[in-house]
Regions:
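Compact, glycine-rich, soluble single-domain proteins
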Residues: 23-169
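Bacterial N-terminal signal peptides
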Residues: 5-16
Length: 169
């Protein structure tokens, strides 16, 4: 009896430790995969969202905006080096997804900016957002919330991109 209870508790603890998973979405010839956001500290007014968008069609499309109940505004931003200084700016005219290509929204690059957060984004939770594309139209997407410093889905905070397979001595 005690052993069975221990096994059940250990199994539940294992599943509780797994990262939140979000489902992929499709609209027209666009596939949105691995949508996720970083958790935010209490009182934060902005948050960031990330995903991959693959265009399997023959014509380009553009991510032109979106909306969500967790923030007042949804903006598409880019981070870019300018004379040795990292700068963030809104993307004007939308983010192009060329035919046969995948565009990744990730920390330090293109990302969706959630401005005027109405609630804290808590690790392990999810939120819905509606993405709007110039040609494909609107699609509802479920975002999994990862840790505050996550660099990609399923990573611990502070992990540097591409460093996961390095052996440290």
């Amino acid at each position: 009896m005690i052993r069975t209870a221990f096994i059940i508790a250990a199994t539940l603890a294992t599943f509780a430790a797994l990262p939140a998973q979000a489902e992929d979405a499709t609209v027209g010839s666009l596939k949105i995969s691995a949508p996720w956001a970083r958790a935010t500290p209490k009182g934060a007014s902005v948050g960031g969202g990330y995903m991959k968008i693959t265009n399997t069609g023959t014509a380009p499309d553009r991510l032109i905006g979106g909306s969500t109940d967790v923030a007042s505004r949804f903006e598409i931003h880019e981070m870019k080096m300018d004379n040795g200084v990292m700068k963030m700016r809104p993307v004007t005219g939308g983010l192009e997804i060329k035919p046969g290509e995948t565009v990744e929204l990730s920390p330090g690059g293109y990302h969706m900016m959630l401005v005027g957060l109405k609630q804290q984004l808590e690790q392990g939770q999810h939120f819905k957002a509606t993405l709007e594309f110039a040609k494909a139209g609107k699609v509802d997407v479920d975002f999994a919330i990862e840790s505050v410093g996550a660099q990609r889905p399923g990573t611990a905070g502070g992990a540097m991109p591409g460093m996961g397979s390095m052996k440290m001595k």
